[in-house]
Structure formats: structure tokens, C-alpha cells
């Protein structure tokens, strides 16, 4: 339904904090990302750190990613900054301002391809709702506009919405 490119910035604490050998609870090989395993941010994480062994840690929110880095629970965090269809992720720009000890240390561009996922025996004409992260819904707006009766339900994560549909056995 929609394809987009978004810049995913890899965020870490200040250089001194990120590399200080006595920083409390500093997890050297751990990276936080927002969403469930399989989220686009985790894909960006794996591509950015493709030559390193890093453990990925899912977070419920972008703020949680920032806080895990500041607390030393993770060495890095990865967040989306912008995409070509829905524009800037303003929440993350705001968080960068709120957390001045967090610095952008790199970026990775990835292609996002969204899929409409449901049970195989359900026709698209029978759908009443589509669940996705607000950015995913925005990126697929043109496609979804072709189905005005389908409600768009914001969910905390695109991968998490798939897990929710499967767990709840939602067929509409």
C-alpha cells in the first residue's frame, strides 16, 4: 500500500557517557528501539550495526528509548526522524530538545514497505478497521482513502498491531 524512506537516527549519550568504563549499568552492546520485535526501527538497527553484535531491546515509546540511554540500560537508541511520505517525526525532534545529553551519532536510511495484514479468509471489503502506528497510517493514507468505511485505529507500533490482531483474532 505505501512505500517510504525514513531517516532513522542512532542516538547515544554524550561521547563521555557512552564510552566511560565506570558508568553505572552501562550496557555496551545493547540498543533500544521503539516497538515490538520486527518493527521498522529494529530493521534499521540491524542494518546500522550489521558488522557488530548488538542486542536489541524493544521499548513502548520513543521517550522510553531516550530514558534507557540516559539511565545506562542501553548504550544506544534508534529512533525515526523523518520519512518521505508523512514528513518529520515531530515527537522525536521535541525529545532531542528535551534530552540535551542525547546526541545523534549516525543515521540509516531504510525503505519502508507497508503491508495490509489480516487473516487469509477475510476479504478487504469486510474490514471495518486498520490498526497501525500513526506514522504508518499517515504513510498509507492515499491507499486507505480508497476505503472510506475502514476506520483507522492508531496503535503504538506497526509490528505490535499485527501481534494484537493475531492475539485478539480480529477478523474485521
Where are these regions (language model features)?
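Domain-level signature for soluble enzymes in the chorismate/prephenate branch of the shikimate pathway
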Residues: 1-172
Amino acid at each position: 500500500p505505501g512505500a517510504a524512506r525514513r531517516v532513522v537516527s542512532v542516538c547515544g549519550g554524550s561521547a563521555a557517557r557512552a564510552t566511560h568504563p565506570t558508568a553505572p549499568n552501562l550496557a555496551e552492546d545493547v540498543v533500544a528501539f521503539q516497538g515490538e520485535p520486527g518493527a521498522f526501527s529494529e530493521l534499521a538497527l540491524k542494518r546500522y550495526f550489521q558488522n557488530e553484535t548488538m542486542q536489541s531491546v524493544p521499548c513502548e515509546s520513543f521517550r522510553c528509548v531516550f530514558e534507557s540511554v540516559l539511565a545506562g540500560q542501553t548504550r544506544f537508541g534508534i529512533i525515526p526522524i523523518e520519512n518521505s511520505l508523512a514528513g518529520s517525526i515531530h515527537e522525536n525532534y521535541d525529545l532531542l530538545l528535551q534530552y540535551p545529553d542525547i546526541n545523534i551519532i549516525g543515521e540509516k536510511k531504510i525503505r519502508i514497505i507497508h503491508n495490509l495484514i489480516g487473516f487469509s479468509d477475510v476479504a478487504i471489503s469486510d474490514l471495518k478497521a486498520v490498526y497501525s502506528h500513526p506514522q504508518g497510517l499517515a504513510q498509507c493514507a492515499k491507499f486507505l482513502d480508497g476505503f472510506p468505511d475502514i476506520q483507522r485505529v492508531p496503535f503504538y507500533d506497526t509490528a505490535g498491531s499485527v501481534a494484537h490482531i493475531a492475539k485478539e483474532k480480529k477478523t474485521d
